[in-house]
Swiss-Prot record:
Organism per entry: Pseudomonas aeruginosa
Name used for this protein in its record: Beta-lactamase LCR-1
Pfam family, one: Transpeptidase
Keyword Lipid biosynthesis: no
InterPro entries: Bact_Transpept/Beta-Lactamase (IPR050515), Beta-lactam/transpept-like (IPR012338), Beta-lactam_class-D_AS (IPR002137), PCN-bd_Tpept (IPR001460)
Residues spanning the membrane: none
Reaction catalyzed: a beta-lactam + H2O = a substituted beta-amino acid
Active site annotation, chain numbering: 63
Residues that hold substrate according to the record: 201-203
GO (cellular component) term, any one: plasma membrane
Stretch forming the signal peptide: 1-19
Single biological process term from Gene Ontology: response to antibiotic
Positions carrying N6-carboxylysine: 66
Amino acid sequence: MLKSTLLAFGLFIALSARAENQAIAKLFLRAGVDGTIVIESLTTGQRLVHNDPRAQQRYPAASTFKVLNTLIALEEGAISGENQIFHWNGTQYSIANWNQDQTLDSAFKVSCVWCYQQIALRVGALKYPAYIQQTNYGHLLEPFNGTEFWLDGSLTISAEEQVAFLRQVVERKLPFKASSYDSLKKVMFADENAQYRLYAKTGWATRMTPSVGWYVGYVEAKDDVWLFALNLATRDANDLPLRTQIAKDALKAIGAFPTK
């Protein structure tokens, strides 16, 4: 009796996982985009991967590198914390939110490239290869441009590697100070309600065709932490909202993103 019960339970779990995959596949299908998402429970290790071949493929990290870059900058003393001020020099950028002074918190949230280029100059290009290797953050092709490498395709990472990296961030297993983790968590904060807190970063790799949109992060729910990394092929800027929309809908589909 016990054996048959366990078999039935195992079959139920398998069928549920398969249904969840189908539900998530429909999100990408309805949007008409090629993409992948990796979701993992920090507590149980339960994993869901849509489009496994793409999940293994590396793409330019783009602004998702700001997660690691923030930790590096804090550790190196290149910035002091989330209230660090970056003074705008008057250069007019195509993104209006960049055309003003920034704090680290605002720079992270609006993906201010010139702010993080200042950070890269303060850290120094020679420091980055060791940090990237030590944290297993994708692959850095050398030689590289010290203020462009996360944008120009020199630094690439897969969705699977993003989740593995985020796991180490959440568990604080990387060689960074507690204060660095604390500041990163503050700037990564994206949303909350009574059931969850969302920490995340977008990215858009535009120097390739098709361009690639990213959304990576984690959800702190009442009984678990769910890591996720999504990327998708974007046709133009009109596709960018799909990054967060599909990721949130996928997390909701498996119960990782409670809304009530």
